[in-house]
UniProtKB/Swiss-Prot annotation:
Species assigned in the record: Klebsiella pneumoniae subsp. pneumoniae (strain ATCC 700721 / MGH 78578)
GO biological process: amino acid biosynthetic process; aromatic amino acid family biosynthetic process; chorismate biosynthetic process
Coiled coil: none
Enzyme class: transferase
Entry-linked PROSITE patterns: EPSP_SYNTHASE_1, EPSP_SYNTHASE_2
Protein name: 3-phosphoshikimate 1-carboxyvinyltransferase
Keyword annotations: Amino-acid biosynthesis, Aromatic amino acid biosynthesis, Cytoplasm, Transferase
Subunit structure: Monomer.
Main location: cytoplasm
One annotated Gene Ontology cellular component of this protein: cytoplasm
EC number(s) stated in the UniProt entry for this protein: 2.5.1.19
Binding site residues for 3-phosphoshikimate: K22, S23, R27, S169, S170, Q171, S197, D313, N336, K340
Record localization: Cytoplasm
Length: 427
């Protein structure tokens, strides 16, 4: 297996221009495809997940042109639901941001489409979404195991009253919201259980509004969406930088700055993961906010005990930053780590122990006490981009660290390690 050894880093200082947000890129691509008119997306993320969405749209007959660096995409809108005359199978890798929204959108009208992906995708639950779509009239078969992909979709979604469980993934609600305006009837979505990752719903609602559709959001418990609507292209849309990707650089600044500045997001960002910077500030770092940047400067870091449900992806970065904080850090209400690219609670606990931390892994929490001195280790990444990026922070000590399968960062950030090296001074 390929590996990358990072030598100890004495200091980080500099500016990182963030790649486009994965969450925003894939939502914007799908809405542009469904909309009337041509949409030019700029700062689109070039990564595996976005390529899977683009390939799927292409197979569904959507016309688009991509710039050579794949960050500018001109999409000719379909002006309504995506249809395929022939039966079709779409391979979506391990891209949840493609699988979930497409599973809903392709239930409009009458298609015969199979959505499949990598082995890990077949282990990621989608039953709550399938159940909700069936309530709205959709014909869906789970081809291997009930409640998991691959799915066979044969259209039929009408709208109406739909209940969806919000406790596992907000992407199920996102998928329903984006599909509902194109249904023949109005849709009323009622949330069962606690809604996780609420800020990701705000991204969805923001993008729908950008494409001309308003949703009646009743305290995140009930959403009313009028049917028989049409998305309208906004013309040009700039994809903001990826706030989850920003977390590694901001944490590096907190641990070994200097000052590290990330551009492409700022105080008015639509992504909830910018709140990650507040956690670093609470730990003792100095954070500065601009309209299109966030900067973080080193401080003496202290442990925190926090509910991280609102920033599950960025919260992983706090787990490795905790290695540099005084005291025991507890991250709570993170059950949905278990249904991501890998079981992230198990993976994080396992790898933190390798570098010497004392770790308590609960069903929905993790508690981390750093060692007096970090130990050298080879870090398994579980084909999970965030594991690789989180554990790069171990090098901000006097101990090197080896990252196995470093190229797994291609899911969201292909040149992550080059960007980290650019702002680093080795010990």
């Amino acid at each position: 297996m390929e590996s990358l050894t990072l030598q100890p880093i004495a200091r980080v200082e500099g500016t990182v221009n963030l790649p486009g947000s994965k969450s925003v890129s894939n939502r914007a691509l799908l809405l542009a495809a469904l909309a009337r008119g041509t949409t030019v997306l700029t700062n689109l993320l070039d990564s595996d997940d976005v390529r899977h969405m683009l390939n799927a749209l292409s197979a569904l007959g959507v016309q688009y042109t991509l710039s050579a660096d794949r960050t500018r995409c001109e999409v000719t809108g379909n002006g309504g639901p995506l249809r395929s005359a022939a039966a079709l199978e779409l391979f979506l890798g391990n891209a949840g941001t493609a699988m979930r929204p497409l599973a809903a959108a392709l239930c409009l009208g009458s298609n015969d489409i199979v959505l499949t992906g990598e082995p890990r995708m077949k282990e990621r639950p989608i039953g709550h979404l399938v159940d909700a779509l069936r309530q709205g009239g959709a014909q869906i078969d789970c081809l291997e195991q009930e409640n998991y992909p691959p799915l066979r979709l044969r259209g039929g979604f009408q709208g109406g009253n739909v209940e969806v469980d919000g406790s596992v993934s907000s992407q199920f609600l996102t998928a329903l919201l984006m599909t509902a305006p194109l249904a023949p009837q109005d849709t009323v979505i009622v949330i069962k259980g606690d809604l996780v990752s609420k800020p990701y719903i705000d991204i969805t609602l923001h993008l729908m509004k950008t494409f001309g559709v308003e949703v009646d959001n009743q305290s995140y418990q009930r959403f009313v969406v009028r049917g028989k609507q049409q998305y309208q292209s906004p013309g040009d849309y700039l994809v903001e930088g990826d706030a989850s990707s920003a977390s590694y650089f901001l944490a590096a600044g907190a641990i070994k700055g200097g000052t590290v500045k990330v551009t492409g997001i700022g105080r008015n960002s639509v992504q909830g993961d910018i709140r990650f910077a507040d956690v670093l500030e609470k730990m003792g770092a100095t954070v500065t906010w601009g309209d299109d940047f966030i900067a973080c400067t080193h401080g003496e870091l202290k442990a925190v005990d926090m509910d991280m449900n609102h920033i599950p992806d960025a919260a992983m970065t706090i787990a490795t930053a905790a290695l540099f904080a005084q005291g025991t850090t507890t991250l709570r209400n993170i059950y949905n780590w278990r249904v991501k690219e890998t079981d992230r609670l198990f993976a994080m606990a396992t790898e933190l122990r390798k570098v010497g931390a004392e770790v308590e892994e609960g069903e929905d929490y993790i508690r981390i006490t750093p060692p007096a001195k970090l130990k050298y280790a080879e870090i398994g990444t579980y084909n999970d981009h965030r594991m690789a990026m989180c554990f790069s922070l171990v090098a901000l000590s006097d101990t090197p660290v080896t990252i196995l399968d470093p190229k797994c960062t291609a899911k969201t950030f292909p040149d992550y390690f080059e960007q980290l090296a650019r702002i680093s001074t080795l010990a």
